């Protein structure tokens, strides 16, 4: 959302100072949510999908910046191996599902099948149709087993995607982010729109609905997504109290000389 108030710059984007203050506040709440998930033994699965450069990685980074990787962990699966290609399609994702007291963030997910794989011709039409039939029931099964499933689709316009790809292309330190798949995705932007619309038609279910995050303004998108994520839980502050640090125990021991160790050069 943009507006004419002083939270936004002349281009209608959220100001950095507003973003920084709000992000700090939200990250504090994410830490509290983390403790609540642990204390209640909740199993939370958050799916992040969208086009290349839509901002999925950015929001995942901010969610995990202050939380414990033992409780809030990222699952970003590589391309399937030859063995995995012979398995039930959902099988390789199952081992990454959350146990009690965990939140798992899926940076792309089984929805590769109905999006990038279908667009690029990496799956057959029969495989695509079977996915659309079986995915809703798979997710209902997860929900029935006690897993909270949240699905976010980051939506970036063709114009903004082009700007972000060009920015990566112009910056040597970021050029590695611009892959051949990104170039193909750019060319097939309309076909990706078809894939997304079909995916929603079949998988936007009551038990695990899709939530669309407009992401042309990355800052606003991150804040909006995290705010919504927090709103899905009626959590309480169960953070542990401050502890008293023990004094170092006096144990008779003489350490070896420091000069016997190899130190890195003191450049700074």
Label each residue range with its predicted role.
Residues 1-268:
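Glycine-rich phosphate-binding loop of ATP-dependent small-molecule kinases
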